[in-house]
Structures are given as C-alpha cells and as structure tokens.
Amino acid sequence: MNTIDMHVHMVGNAASGHGCWVRVTALKAPLYGLMLRKLNLEFSALEKSSFDDLFRDRLLNFIRASGIDAACLLAQEAVYKDDGTVWKDAGNAFIPNDYVLGLARDYKEFIPAVSIHPARPDAIEELHRCLEQGAAMMKCLPNCQNINCNDSKFKPFWNLMAETGLPLLAHTGGEHTLQVVNADYADPETLRLPLECGVNVIAAHAATGSGPFDPDYVPTLIRLMREFQNLYADTSALNVPTRSYGLRPCLESELLAGRVVHGSDYPVPTSPAWAWLRGLIDSDQWTSLKRISNPIE
C-alpha cells in the first residue's frame, strides 16, 4: 500500500509563465519569509522567473528522500463573488488546474488535486474537463474563496463529484496564512450539503483554529462524523502551536481514529515540539524527531 501525503501546496509566481501568482501583504510577509527559509530559499526568490521550478524541485527532492510515495498537489482557485464573477481584489495565491494536472503527468510523485469554485458559470464543464485529465481530488477553502458549500444551487456540482467518486478536501477552522473573506465558512457545518449528496469529504486541519481567537470547531466536526460516515479529517498543520490541541482527539477518539488521513500542509512549517508539549510523545521521541530536516518526512 502506498503512503500518500494528502495535503501539499504548490506555490508559483507570475514571472514563470505557468499562470500562477502569489500576493504577499506586509502583514503576511514574515510568515512567507519563514516558510521560504525552511526551504533554503530567500524571500527575493519569489520574484524570480525560476521560482516555480525551484519550488517544484525542492518538493520532489523532499518526497523522494522521505517515506512518502506520492503527494496530492493542490491547485488554488481564485476567489469568486456570490454572483459567479471573480473577486479581483481578494486572495493571496492562484495555482491553475492545468499546471497541477501537467505536473502530475510529468512526475509520478504528484497526484493532482484541482480547485474549482462551484459559483463559476463553467464550474460543471471545468469539473468534467479536469476529471477527463486525471483529477484525483478537489480542494477548496470555503472561508478564503467565499464558497457557501450549502448553497442549493451547487447541488449539481456536488452530485457530479459524488457520482464520479471525486473526494473533496475542504479547509475547516481558522486561517491566517491566506486572506479570509468569510470567516463563517470555516465551520464544518458548511460542508453538510456535499456530505448529503454523498461526496467523500476530508475536513482539512480537523477543524482546528489557526489563531488564539478562532472558534474551536473540533466538537462540531466530531458530531458531523457521527452523522456522516463519508466525512474524514486530515492532520495538516496540527503540529503548529495554535492547532496542536487537535492532535489528541485525532489520536485518541475512537470515532476519528479510523477516519483521519495524513497531510503535511507543506510548506507550512511544523514542529514535533507541540506534540511533546501536549504530552503525546516523550522527550526521547521529540529529540529524535527534531533531527529530521525533511518537512515531508
């Protein structure tokens, strides 16, 4: 059985010609700088035409040097308004579906996860197109992309995903790496309609908060997992200070234990220190784990 990292981000810039872009605000620059330093990249690399290739090659090297066989590489859709038009001033990043699909064709280590806003006028057509090209998963960030997944007009979109067996990886809980446009959509209850339609849904970050004042949606997630057998969670970024409280229920809850999948949230930097401080690993394990420099491992 292959070991898969279900939650790996691609980052690209407008200088590469791949159609990607990244917008770093002054408020978020320190966090982006930290992520780049962890990859041995200078902040200035974001402006270089070679950045996409540098980021791709580092990721491939990390995967190949790890116990992971492949990673789900996430596209990043634009932010859309409720009327289906692009919200041009919103969003921090864009990674086209075609770029992720192409990388997956070129490298066996990548599994393509596309991103389609269901409010797009061509959402159904784009979903068909991506499925034909080998999409293995769909990723969305409801609170960052302005997606009310419970809107009844999206039901045909969710039905098609259910019929074709395409799983949905949906951000749940707070978010501070990317711009949030509707904080209410961080609630896992936002995923009720796709669940009712039969979509296999993975609640990214297990509905944990990203900041000290974010609501704790873990109890909501557990309640929904009792109600829906097609709801899962992932471990992405649970080894950061603010989300680490979610580690214990993911490890110890009988309900969650069999329905939690692995995700690194690469390139978000994590540390085993938080599992140690939460009493989930001992000091010897922490000492051993902190020697691992490969973020995918």
Predicted region positions:
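An N-terminally biased module of ancient metal coordination in phosphate/nucleic-acid-related enzymes
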Residues: M1-L74, Y80-G91, L289
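Hydrophobic faces of well-ordered beta-strands that scaffold small-molecule active sites
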Residues: I4-V8, A70-L73, I111-V114, M138-C140, ...
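Active-site environment of divalent metal-dependent phosphoester hydrolases
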Residues: H9-A14, A78-K81, P118-D122, Q145, ...
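Short, flexible/disordered intra-domain loops and linkers
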Residues: F43-K48, Y80-N92, T177-Y185, G209-Y217, ...
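Short, acidic/polar
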Residues: L54-I63, A119-C130, V218
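Generic structural signal for hydrophobic
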Residues: F62-S66, C130, M161, P194, ...
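Active-site gating/metal-coordination segments in enzymes
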Residues: A75-A183
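H/E-rich (His + Asp/Glu) clusters that bind or coordinate divalent metals
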Residues: N200, A207-E297
